[in-house]
Amino acid sequence: MSITIKKASEIAKLRRANEIVAKTLDYLKQEVRSGVSLKELNRMGESYIQSLGARAAFKGLYGFPAGVCTSVNEVIIHGIPNDYILQEGDIVGLDIGTEVDGWYGDSAVTLSVGNISPSDVSLIACAKDALYYAISIIEPEMRFKELSYALEQFILARGYVPLR
């Protein structure tokens, strides 16, 4: 599978959906703190998405019950918001998708709740650096397999092992 270049009109539609994702993540970043539940973060995220004229794309997708995926600590991705209350030292991933007029936006962030261990700081930095590395090397018609291999090598060189 190759990466398809979109037309300017399609990019504008994708941009709108992704702007709402970015605004929602920025909003939720301010709410991530000790004492807040994952269900509350989801409620705030869904309401905010709707207030901006979009639909929470993940809600109902394959039966997923929420608009915001909340992954805490050992949960890798696509965690379901529950009654868990965030605590100092937690690492939380927020993954959000929006739909506007049939066009989708999707992004995620990893955040710390207060202070986290140096090893956790290093792991998060590696993930962020890997993202920027991928952006710097991606080219039109590049195959996902090629990009995945390059990222694997980047991560291994930093002393981490990608999930399989």
Where do the PLM segments sit?
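Active-site neighborhoods and metal-handling regions in enzymes and metal-associated proteins
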Residues: M1-R164
